[in-house]
UniProtKB/Swiss-Prot annotation:
It comes from Priestia megaterium (strain ATCC 12872 / QMB1551) (Bacillus megaterium). A possible function for this protein is to guide the assembly of the membrane sector of the ATPase enzyme complex. InterPro entries: ATP_synth_I, ATP_synth_I_Bacilli. It holds the Pfam family ATP-synt_I. Belongs to the bacterial AtpI family. This is ATP synthase protein I. One of its GO terms (biological process) is proton transmembrane transport. The chain crosses the membrane at residues 15-35, 36-53, 72-92, 97-117.
Amino acid sequence: MQDLQHVFPRLRSYILYLLALYVLGWGFTSYKAVFAGLILGTALSLYNLWNLVRKFEQFGQALDEGKKPRSIGTVVRFATAALAVVITISYPKTFHIISVVVGLMTYYVVIIIDLVVQNMRRR
């Protein structure tokens, strides 16, 4: 399996394509709150993915150097989700809460789909 450092550019581009679609949906449909929520959640999801890749790199580097590895950033991912919820609750007419949560889960779904597609290509 490829490491996250090599897969990250591909995953980032998929998420940026999704963000572009969400921006088009926000601009051309009447579902502004839903697409704004997807944009907020997916943008924070992209940050979480970048942070996860960075933490895994630091984790592996610490193991290689024989040091005690630090956490892989779970608290930061929870804090990002909490930030998204606080923003959504503060502006309920602007952001749809369920679409924010779906957006936050985007990078998990993109990773799974990418893994399945890459495994099918190798066969």
